[in-house]
Every structure is written in structure tokens, then in C-alpha cells.
Design a protein with these regions (language model features):
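Hydrophobic alpha-helical transmembrane segments of multipass integral membrane proteins
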Residues: 23-34, 54, 80-93, 252
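Membrane-embedded alpha-helical segments of integral membrane proteins
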Residues: 15-65
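Transmembrane alpha-helices and immediately adjacent membrane-cytoplasm interface residues
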Residues: 56-102
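A transmembrane-helix-recognition feature enriched in membrane-embedded lipid enzymes
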Residues: 244-264
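Structural signature of transmembrane alpha-helix termini at the membrane-water interface
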Residues: 31-38, 58-62, 91-98, 135, ...
Length: 264
């Protein structure tokens, strides 16, 4: 009898811990979403964060009932499919994070700074971090060209490339080393259009550096190789915590899209 009671208490404590974990996760995700909303960072990743917050709250509140409800028939297969999806998502997250490092050697021929958002003609904090990393790189290897790549913004208030070029010149980078690519609307186009400019201007690009955020390195390197930049090195920049969560969630979708639709 004592053994049965003891097992029951252990079971109840486990349920309480599970509920508490998902309640806390729900609150943290909700706070993350509110902060990004206040900042004006409205993206697909933000909507996913709010959706996950709601799902975590529902699971914390009703996980026993939901588990029992999905214990047989089609709902059981649906539960297994959801678990499989979560596992695949976590594997992709691990893959992305495992590649989020810098591997430059400061002997490359050119730098490509990938666009990351502009508002009212000013670079976003994320893009500023990339440009600052590029400036630091230039001070260590000034015998290069810097391509800033990014087309019209969501609000049609100029191109990312123009804002990036202005930021670089305002911070001491000579105008004659800056190459502007202002037509692209995706990472794949960043590379394709920049490579065409390099070839038209006969700029050496045997070895290049691409500058982007840590969460974006894996996909950016795959696209670079796909577009013919065989010797592409990553210059990784940090992402602040509130931006990182939705960005990583969204990046998984980007990687899946890349493998399924883009790299053919």
C-alpha cells in the first residue's frame, strides 16, 4: 500500500513539474513576442512565437486530457506526427547552431554583407552588427572590395544596399571599395546578383567572406557554394536574445525550403 501511495505521489510531482515547465515556457515566449512587437520586428517568426506560447499554455493546462484524447485511432497517429515534427525541428535547430561560427583567415579577396532590414533609410540593429563586423574585418584586411547586397525594403523607402553603403562610408570605409547590389530580395539572389557584378567588373572573388548572423550561417554558406563561390568563409555576428528565438524558428523553415525547393 505504501509503495502504491509513493508511486502516486511521484507521478503527481512529475505532472506538476511538466505543467510548471510549460507554463514558464509559455510566459517567456509571450514576453519575447511582446518585446519584439514593441520594437516593430513583425515577422513570420514573431507570429510563430505567439502561436507556440499559446500551445505551451494549452499543453500545460490540459496535457493529461490531451494525452488521453490522443491515445487511439487517427488522433494517436496525429500525436506521433506532431512528436516527429518537433524532433525534426530540433534536429534542424542543432544543425543550424553547429555551423554558427566564424572561419575567416583575413586573406580573402572580397566581402559580401547580406542585407537584414532597413527602416526609414536607417539600418536595423541586426544589420548594424553585420556592418560593424565588416568594418572590423576591413581594418585587418583592407585589400578587398566590399559588396553590400539588398534590394527594396518592405516599406519601399529605399534599398538596403544604399543604407548599408551610407553606414560604411559614415564609418570611414572608402567609397571606391564599396560595391552596391540593390536588386536582390533573398539570400540566393544576394549571391547571384553580386557574383554577376563581380564578373562584370572583373573583381577577383576566388575567396570571399560573407557577413551574416550566427543563425543564418548554415543556409548562407550552402547558397554561396550553390551560386559558385566555392571558397566562401563566414563572418558570424551575434544576435540579441529576443531576436534570436523567432529568427531561429523562422530559419528552420528557411533551411527546409532551401533543401526542398531551392537546391535542385
Amino acid at each position: 500500500m505504501y509503495e502504491i501511495i509513493n508511486r502516486f505521489l511521484i507521478y503527481k510531482r512529475s505532472l506538476v513539474k511538466i505543467s510548471l515547465f510549460f507554463y514558464i515556457l509559455s510566459v517567456l515566449l509571450f514576453i519575447n513576442g511582446i518585446v519584439l512587437t514593441v520594437r516593430g520586428n513583425v515577422t513570420v517568426g514573431l507570429y510563430i512565437v505567439f502561436g507556440l506560447s499559446i500551445c505551451c499554455f494549452i499543453w500545460a493546462k490540459f496535457h493529461i486530457q490531451l494525452w488521453q484524447l490522443t491515445s487511439s485511432g487517427i488522433l494517436l497517429w496525429l500525436r506521433r506526427l506532431v512528436i516527429l515534427g518537433i524532433a525534426v525541428y530540433l534536429i534542424f535547430m542543432g544543425l543550424i547552431l553547429s555551423c554558427s561560427y566564424t572561419d575567416v583567415d583575413y586573406t580573402e579577396d572580397a566581402v559580401i554583407v547580406l542585407g537584414a532590414g532597413v527602416t526609414n533609410g536607417k539600418v536595423s540593429k541586426t544589420l548594424q552588427n553585420r556592418l560593424d563586423a565588416c568594418i572590423d574585418y576591413y581594418h585587418k584586411n583592407s585589400d578587398i572590395y566590399i559588396a553590400v547586397s539588398g534590394g527594396l525594403t518592405r516599406f519601399k523607402d529605399g534599398t538596403e544596399a544604399e543604407a548599408m553603403a551610407k553606414y560604411l562610408t559614415d564609418n570611414g570605409i572608402p567609397e571606391d571599395v564599396i560595391i552596391i547590389e540593390d536588386k536582390s530580395q533573398s539570400t540566393l539572389e544576394n549571391y547571384r546578383f553580386t557574383k554577376q557584378i563581380f564578373e562584370d567588373k572583373k573583381i577577383c572573388h576566388d575567396s570571399i567572406v560573407f557577413v551574416t548572423n550566427d543563425f543564418h550561417i548554415y543556409r548562407a554558406k550552402k547558397y554561396a557554394t550553390y551560386c559558385g563561390f566555392e571558397n566562401a568563409h563566414a563572418l558570424s555576428t551575434r544576435t540579441d536574445l529576443f531576436t534570436f528565438v523567432p529568427a531561429l524558428i523562422r530559419e528552420v523553415l528557411g533551411v527546409i525550403d532551401m533543401w526542398v525547393f531551392k537546391l535542385k
